[in-house]
């Protein structure tokens, strides 16, 4: 059974996330995450519509320059489960993740299966990060993107 997790992808302030995560209704969802045996996700690149929306929202609060600088300095390639990762699949050293609604990606170590669904070669950099970070046990991928993935093996 799916559960709606009605929070923003990124909070404007880390403190907002900390306060919300203490709420009992949110705690129930977080406990479900921690006891799941399967994760289904799709990697997101940083230029997707939802991430442009977040950047626009940040611009409205005067944070967009800071966010863009943080993304550049940490060399984020995309998102896995709404958590920023770098090209090696690392997420811990990306400060902006303190504002992300996604789980600690070490959660992936505790599940039997992590199914990654990918469509579109624009997600390849993030897919490579997800593969390097060992977040993928099963990959569902469209044929053109699969071809590009295979072709890119030598450069990654």
Give the positions of each predicted feature.
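Conserved phosphate- and dinucleotide-binding cores of soluble alpha/beta proteins
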Residues: 1-156
């Amino acid at each position: 059974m799916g559960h709606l997790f009605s929070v923003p992808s990124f909070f404007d302030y880390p403190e907002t996330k900390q306060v919300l995560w203490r709420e009992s209704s949110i705690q129930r969802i977080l406990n479900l995450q921690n006891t799941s045996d399967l994760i289904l996700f799709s990697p997101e690149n940083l230029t997707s519509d939802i991430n442009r929306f977040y950047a626009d929202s940040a611009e409205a609060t005067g944070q967009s320059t800071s966010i863009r600088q943080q993304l550049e300095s940490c060399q984020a390639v995309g998102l896995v489960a709404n958590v920023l990762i770098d090209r090696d699949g690392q997420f811990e050293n990306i400060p902006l993740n303190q504002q992300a609604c996604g789980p600690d990606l070490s959660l992936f170590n505790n599940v039997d299966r992590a199914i990654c669904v990918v469509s579109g070669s624009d997600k390849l950099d993030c897919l490579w990060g997800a593969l390097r970070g060992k977040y993928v046990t099963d990959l569902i991928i469209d044929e053109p993107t699969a071809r590009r993935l295979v072709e890119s093996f030598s450069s990654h």
